[in-house]
Structures are given as C-alpha cells and as structure tokens.
Amino acid sequence: MGQCRVFPGLRTLHQWVVHAPSGFAPLSVLFENRYTMKKIAAVALLTLGAVLAGCSKQEPAAPAATPAPAAVTKIVVGLDDNFPPMGFRNEKNELIGFDIDMAKEAAKRLGLEVGFKPIDWSAKEAELSGKRVDALWNGLTITEERKQNILFTAPYMENHQIIVVAANSAIKTKADLAGKVVGAQEGSSAVDAIKKDEAVFKSFKDIKTFGDNVTALMDLTTGRLDAVVVDEVVGRYYVAKKPDVYAVLDDHFGTEDYGVGLRKDDTDLHGKLDKALADMKADGVAAKIAEQWFGKNILK
C-alpha cells in the first residue's frame, strides 16, 4: 500500500504529485483542472438554465385592439302611423306627414339613409332602448318623466292638449266634463296632462284609453265618449276635415313641446341632429315644410 505501481520508482502518492514523469501533469494540476472544469460546467449549466428559463417565459399577448364602432349610415325612426298630420298612411299606403318630411330632410343633411318603423306607441321607450328603432319622431312630447330614459333634441314645435267634443255637444269648458266619459290615446302625453289637472280628472265618470286617436274619435262620433283629449295638431286636422262632426273647446290641458327622442348614450347623433334642425329653421326649409302641412309656420 502507498506504492505507485504504474510508474516504478515513484513509491508514494506524494512522489507522484511532486515528481510526475515528463508528459504527465502533476495530480495537483489535474485535480485543479478538474475542479476548474466543474466550475465551468456549473456556470455553463446555470447560464443555460437562465437562457432556457427566459425562453420559457413568453411575453404576454398584446391585448386585442378594440374594433372601431361601425360608422352610422342609417337611422330608423319609430312612429305611430295613425297620427296625422305628423305621420300616417295615404291612400297608397305610403307613410307621409310633417314629421316624416322633417326626418327625411334632416337625414339628407347628415348624409344618412332614413327608415320608418310603425310601433306600438305605448311601448315606444322599450322599442328605443331595445335598439329596434334609433329615434322617436312623431309628435313626441318632452316631459320630465320621459327625460329619465330619453335624450331629447331641442324643442321644434309647441303643442296643446285640446278637448274635442261632438259638434252639437253641450260641453263648453273643462268644468262641463264632470260626470262624463273622456278618451285619450294610451301612453300619450294627453293622459299625463289630464291626470295633472287632478280636480278635473277626479270629476270624470271614467277615462278610457285607446291604441290610437282615430279609434277614440270614432267612439266620440258614436256617442260612447263625451270628449277626447288629443294633441292639437292631430285634433285640428280631423276637425278641419269634419267641422260638422267635431268641435274644439277653448279650454285645454296645458302647453307642451315636441322633440325628437334618442337613446341617452347616443350623444353624437344628438348633437348632429340638433344642428341639422337648427339649420333647417335658419334657412327656412322647416318653415316651408310646416306651411305645406299646417298652412302656416307653427314651429318654435
């Protein structure tokens, strides 16, 4: 034990370390080199691990770009198609009327196509919020209650809720409506106006609502109603056609304004439409449309 059998003459490991034959590195050098190689290998492994770790960490995907909203090219107007002279059907079943012509002119100025969709007027707010129509443009009265859900343009016309009776009726004032049956369109501002005049409203025998004003006026003609409360523009249209059948009282249920109704978040269209209506008034086009339908300019 202790002798170096590989190289005779070098009896001990110490002698091998100190006196290694020529061409052989001393064990101390070999050991040192081996140690150095281990360090190099360790560093290399650490470096490789770091590189691989870096490669394995994928960069987070860039968030998908939010697509730009599609440009508006058309608006759909919701209306009651039995509301002359604002919007109704002629003998050819075509939609015509003052508000129809106003909407067409405004859309032309905005570079938009316009479509018209008859709706259940009592469900108009649901039609608008459900995006089945883009605007309510049909003698829509601006009220504080409606403002909670609808964005209105500036008023374009003043209106009154008038009282229409039979031409031979003994009813001459609101006070004469006590004990009478009064009709109005369901979901209309006529109903709201009546209820605001609490004393008169409570004096009625009954109030009946109808899907449209035409049906209410027919019931007035047959005697099932004693009076109908209706928008002035509509009431006077029918009275002018049948002055021997209907009459209008001097009393009415208040003054109100018409505006175009939009969704609350549709501020871009609101601004553009407001400007178009203002321009139409300024250049006289709106007045010409009014004169065509009412015989005079009744716009605000």
List each model region and its residues:
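C-terminal motif of bacterial Sec signal peptides marking the signal peptidase cleavage site
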Residues: 51-54
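Ligand-binding clefts/hinges and TM-proximal coupling segments of bilobed small-molecule sensing domains
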Residues: 57-63, 189-208, 247-249, 278-300
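Flexible hinge/capping segments at coil-to-helix
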Residues: 63-69, 165-182
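Extracytoplasmic small-molecule ligand-binding "clamshell" domains
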Residues: 64-139
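Periplasmic-binding protein-like
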Residues: 81, 158-165, 236-278, 294-300
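Ligand-binding cleft/hinge of the Venus flytrap
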Residues: 89, 103-111, 190-209, 239-243
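Short helices/loops that flank or line small-molecule/ion binding pockets
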Residues: 104-109, 117-118, 122-135, 149-151, ...
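A ligand-binding cleft/hinge motif common to bilobed small-molecule-binding domains
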Residues: 140-148, 193-198, 221-222, 226-254
